Every structure is written in C-alpha cells, then in structure tokens.
Amino acid sequence: VELTGTPSSNGLIDLWAQIYLLDGGERLGKTIGQYRERFFDPDKRNRTTIFSYAPKDGSLEYIQKAIGDICISMKSEDYLEMPERIYDEVPVVLDAPAAKAYKQLERELLLETDEGMITAGTAGVLTGKLLQLCNGAVYDSDRHALAIHQCKIEAFLEVLEQLNGQHALVFYNFQHDRDRLLAALEPLGLRVRVYQNTADEDAWNAGEIDVLMAHPASCAYGLNLQNGGHHIIWFGLVWSLEQYEQANKRLHRQGQKHPVVIHHLVVQGGMDEDVITALQRKGDTQEALMAALKARIKKAKEGAS
C-alpha cells in the first residue's frame, strides 16, 4: 500500500516512480526514460538542456486508464469537515527604478548596481534572480544581498495592517526576504518569530505570536498550526506545487475554526505572475487526475460492502 498527498506534485512526470513501486513498471514502463519518451515531448529547453516536459496529446487520459485499477483517490474535503479557503491576489506594482532594473536583467541577463555585479548564465538561474528581484533584493556572486526596492515590503505591511491584529503565517523564499521582513517588522512592536522548532509551533498555537515567518520547505509537513491563526501571506512564491499546497495545509486542516485566507503578493508583469500561472496549471493537472481516479473510491467501497 502506498499513500501520497500529492500524486503528481509537479505534473504527470512525477507519477512514474510512485506507480513503478506498485507494479514494477508494468503500466507506465520499466524506466523513467521510457515513460518520458512515450508520453511527453520536450517543453522548455535550450541547445543543450531540457528544463521541462509537456504531456503529449491523449497522455493524461491513457495514464488515468492505465493506473485506474490500482489507484483510488480520496480528498480530505470528501470525508472531513474542512474550512473554506479564500485566495487573495495582492498586486504589487514596481516603481520606475525597480521596473527598469527588472527589465534590464531580463533583457540582458546582467544587472549592475553600485555595490557589485550579478550574472544569470542559465534560464534556471535567471528565474531565481527575477524572483528575488520581484521580492526586492538579489544575491551577488559572493552571496551578498543587494537591496533593489521596497515595493513588495510596503505591500506586505499594508496587508498586515488590514488584518487588524489577526495573526499571520508568512512564507518567504530567500534568506534575504526573511532578513528584510524582520527589519521592516521590528519597529511595529509585534511578536515576531522565524519558525525553528516545536517551541515555535506551541507558541503560535497558544496565540503568543503575531507573525510567524517560515520557509515552506521547513514546515510543509507534519505541523499543526491551525489554532494560531487563519491568514497566510506568501511574500515569495515557490515553483513546487507540493511545497505550496502542503504549506497552505498547515492552517487549512481539520480543527481550523475560520475560513483560511491565502494572500499572494504578486509583482505585476514579473516572474511572480508566471509562478502563479504555473501553480494553477499544475493544480489543474492534479485536479483532473484526482477527479478521474475518484470513481475508484465508489468501486472500492462497493467491493468492500
């Protein structure tokens, strides 16, 4: 028996390993290479490297049918009383200097500041640089954070003010995000912590923390934070659908007494918008997969009765 909360966390490409453990490659192929060649075409790539794959026409339907006899799908919403989830997209408009710097880096893969030089030699590195720049600072080659703008910090503080004292779980992506957020929060007199261990979990649930900051990778699994608040603020988004969904489930889980509001700070025209789109696209893929397998629940229940 194999259990997973996100069967295709980053799209259908992730399914092969899980199904291979169940059937030894009978349904989707003996190797990941065979699986990719049969069901996917290269998507984003350069001359030497393939960064991602896109399903061929009909692949989703074939895969669903192929694994339907050994998989059943159950969502927590189907058997638990779950609170409502509300998504709030907060647009962040870069000021003129920040927008100019962003466009320059995107166009030339090179950004010069008075404090040093930052290079982005590959698409993957460029993506990271642009996400950093959306957030307001960028690491140089020596891992020094160069501050570029305060636009997203200001938007974050506005959202926090609108919460009117309600507690917030804040997810950041880069260490310089955390450091700049801490500096911005310091004058406000709020009880702020960066999540490190169960002592922080206990203090949050006891109502002793106004703002709990965390990287989604550090608390995406196993933490029960539903008693400490019902607002999530994504200061810096991540590409991983699994990390994103699991992080949101720290508050959106059984025992939460309020609707969970998930605020996304999204730089207009920036890489943030691409991340939101990618998360939504992967989510749609996963929802389609889960829906198609749902019929197995009914069949399994009928077989057990």
PLM feature segments, named:
Residues 36, 91-92, 131, 167-174, ...:
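Short beta-strand segments
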Residues 2, 27-145, 149-166, 262, ...:
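Inter-lobe coupling linker of SF2 helicases/translocases
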Residues 239-305:
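A conserved SF2-helicase RecA2
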Residues 11-22, 62-66, 103, 181-184:
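PAPS/PAP-binding and catalytic site of the sulfotransferase fold
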Residues 169-171, 179-219:
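Conserved helicase ATPase core of P-loop NTP-dependent helicases/translocases
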Residues 16-31, 230:
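A short helix-turn-beta junction within AAA+ P-loop NTPase domains corresponding to the substrate/partner-engaging
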Residues 17, 224-237, 261-264:
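A short beta-strand element within the Helicase C-terminal
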Residues 1-12:
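Conserved helicase ATPase motor motifs in RecA-like P-loop NTPase domains
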